[in-house]
């Protein structure tokens, strides 16, 4: 255990060190929020992959494989990989907008009311997503140290708040780049060791109920739902879109997205396999502890240290991206809307750091209240995506749209999505499908009615040349 902890502590100190280094690169708020719009395709792919391969795609997938989904839990990540490849078709339009936030673009086209609603949805969802990643990190710390889970949550939250506070998007991007390679290496080398120490593949398979080995146990409807869910959240979620805004050009946005999708698909089933190994070797543990238990009990200390550093890096990366998303949206959209004036650049930088701290404290509170990982992830994705989805994407892609079409679609989509989620997805239809469908239909109907009545076309989403 000492070796495992030594590796993890060295990793943590390295991340804090990168935060201090990134702080020296921060000259203004554009550097803090967008890394100066200088990300190349490899850096973009790395930061996207590390951000999206978070607690849900590591600890969450392993726990679902241990539990009700079995091997098919890997489709949760494959779906995300497919979705982010699809986002490559709209990525250049995002970059062309030269914006900082999703609500900023919505505000340009549909007005301040739409911008404020989208901002609130984004802040609530990103805060919840930060809490999910803190919970995933804390579950590892809890198993390794024996600390009370609530204490582990507080420690994990404090670390991610600290290095995001220091370096903003530069620290997030640099740590993401390092973290992605740790994730891949850690998981790739863990499987053969875990299999061998659990008694070999034949023994592991013999200990697992046959239905847990079903490749598509979760069902094609759920898989399709996840693809739609992730396409929506990657194309409207601030922590993902902010990275496209930070790309150095439109071509970079396309190739970074495609490369990220490929990397995620290659990684997808590794956590699921480790979850099944945990089921075979430790059939009576808590689901969320599956990955950490395999690491501690079945892997050599050095390999366990690398794997758990990879898991912690994945969750911290996602958490930092969401913290920064909240700061960006509040400063660029909420503050400007409420107080009717923009902050001076250095004042904006200070305010952004303050918001990171406040959001981090709030996320720790959410994490202390609820330790569910994937259910909270899906609910957060539903909140932030179902309403703004049609308004944001059609606002980028279609010239002839009206302000009221955007506002109506945001309200209707959000209400339908949240209501459907509260009703626990009647008829097996995911809330994100119902909400986004309602949003799209509302947008198209209102837009057609208003265009026929001669209502003015909304201003463009793009800055003037």
Regions found by a protein language model. Give the residues of each.
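Membrane-embedded helix-loop-helix hairpins and adjacent transmembrane boundary segments
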Residues: 1-465
């Amino acid at each position: 255990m000492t070796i495992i902890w030594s590796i993890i502590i060295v990793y943590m100190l390295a991340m804090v060190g990168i935060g201090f280094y990134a702080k020296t690169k921060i000259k203004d708020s554009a550097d803090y929020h967008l890394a100066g719009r200088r990300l190349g395709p490899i850096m973009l792919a790395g930061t996207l992959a590390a951000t999206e391969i978070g607690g849900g795609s590591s600890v969450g997938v392993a726990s679902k494989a241990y539990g009700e989904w079995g091997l098919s839990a890997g489709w949760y990540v494959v779906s995300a990989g497919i979705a982010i490849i699809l986002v490559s078709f709209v990525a250049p339009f995002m970059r062309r907008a030269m914006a900082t936030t999703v609500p900023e673009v919505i505000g340009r086209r549909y007005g301040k009311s739409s911008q404020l609603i989208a901002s609130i949805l984004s802040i609530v969802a990103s805060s919840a997503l930060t809490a999910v990643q803190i919970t995933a990190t804390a579950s590892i710390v809890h198993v390794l140290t024996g600390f009370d889970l609530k204490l582990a949550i507080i420690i994990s939250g404090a670390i991610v708040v600290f290095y995001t506070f220091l370096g903003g998007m530069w620290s997030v991007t640099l740590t993401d780049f390092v973290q992605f390679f740790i994730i891949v290496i850690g998981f790739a080398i863990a499987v053969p060791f875990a299999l061998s120490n659990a008694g070999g593949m034949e023994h592991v398979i013999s200990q697992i109920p046959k239905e847990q080995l079903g490749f598509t146990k979760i069902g094609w409807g759920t898989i399709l739902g996840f693809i739609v869910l992730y396409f929506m959240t990657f194309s409207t979620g601030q922590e993902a879109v902010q990275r496209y805004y930070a790309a150095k050009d439109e071509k970079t946005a396309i190739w970074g997205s495609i490369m990220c999708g490929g990397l995620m698909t290659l990684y997808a089933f590794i956590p699921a396999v480790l979850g099944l190994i945990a089921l075979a070797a430790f059939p009576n543990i808590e689901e969320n502890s599956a990955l950490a238990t395999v690491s501690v009990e079945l892997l050599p200390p050095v390999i366990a240290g690398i794997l758990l550093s990879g898991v912690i890096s994945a969750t911290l990366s996602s958490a930092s991206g969401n913290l920064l998303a909240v700061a960006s949206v509040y400063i660029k959209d909420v503050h400007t809307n409420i107080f009717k004036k923009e902050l001076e650049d250095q004042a904006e930088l200070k305010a952004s750091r303050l918001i990171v701290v406040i959001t981090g404290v709030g996320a720790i509170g959410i994490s202390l209240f609820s330790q569910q990982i994937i259910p909270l992830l899906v609910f957060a994705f539903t909140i932030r995506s179902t309403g703004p989805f049609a308004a944001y994407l059609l606002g980028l892609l279609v010239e002839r749209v009206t302000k009221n079409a955007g506002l109506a679609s945001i309200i209707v989509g959000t209400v339908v999505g949240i209501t459907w989620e509260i009703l626990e997805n009647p008829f097996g239809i995911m809330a994100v499908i119902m909400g986004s469908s309602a949003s799209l239909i509302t947008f198209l109907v209102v837009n057609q009615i208003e265009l026929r009545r001669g209502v003015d076309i909304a201003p463009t989403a793009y800055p003037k040349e």
